Amino acid sequence: MSLKHRYRETIRPKLLKDLGLSNIHQVPKVVKVNVNRGLGEAAQNSKTLEASLSEMATITGQKALVTRAKKAIAGFKIREGMPIGCTVTLRGERMYAFLERLINLALPRIRDFRGVSPKSFDGRGNYTLGVKEQLIFPEISFDKIDTIRGMDITIVTSARSDEEGRALLKALGFPFRST
């Protein structure tokens, strides 16, 4: 059973009852997943950016968008418009497929993994997770990468509070660390 189907059939009715909501449309849901990688060295080395774009496309199944510097910063040797990273916004079926792979395959492959931090909510029910290395995803082979780079994964939900967001992600299967 896919994650989307499981959400619709079992998780949503359970959350409706647990959160004490009156309407099925009030139940929090995952709106989008944003996968972001900042590459400061991409301004000097274009191969870094190309490798990162192909890795992100392999991991997410969607072409990555190049993020560019909004203004020049002399201390970082960056001019306006220089490429400084890449990002992918996932919605719909690809989003659920990515979340399923993240929860069931990627997170358990992290070294010394004891669960994700329950404190990374932003106050509005959205969750941000930092990944230190791209090797946790089974699509990336160790031989094909030049350097180990991390990425930020933001899960945007329709939840109105952190408690609702935490309840949603816990129901989806996120392994939160007990504090």
Curated annotation (Swiss-Prot):
Molecular function per GO: rRNA binding; structural constituent of ribosome; tRNA binding
InterPro entries: Ribosomal_uL5, Ribosomal_uL5_bac-type, Ribosomal_uL5_C, Ribosomal_uL5_CS, Ribosomal_uL5_dom_sf, Ribosomal_uL5_N
UniProt-listed GO biological process terms: translation
Pfam families: Ribosomal_L5, Ribosomal_L5_C
CC terms in the record's Gene Ontology section: ribonucleoprotein complex; ribosome
Top-rank taxon, per record: Bacteria
Record bears the keyword Magnesium: no
SUPFAM superfamilies, alphabetized: RL5-like
Quaternary assembly: Part of the 50S ribosomal subunit; part of the 5S rRNA/L5/L18/L25 subcomplex. Contacts the 5S rRNA and the P site tRNA. Forms a bridge to the 30S subunit in the 70S ribosome.
Family under the similarity heading: Belongs to the universal ribosomal protein uL5 family.
Function: This is one of the proteins that bind and probably mediate the attachment of the 5S RNA into the large ribosomal subunit, where it forms part of the central protuberance. In the 70S ribosome it contacts protein S13 of the 30S subunit (bridge B1b), connecting the 2 subunits; this bridge is implicated in subunit movement. Contacts the P site tRNA; the 5S rRNA and some of its associated proteins might help stabilize positioning of ribosome-bound tRNAs.
Protein's UniProt name: Large ribosomal subunit protein uL5
Origin organism lineage: Bacteria, Bacillati, Cyanobacteriota, Cyanophyceae, Synechococcales
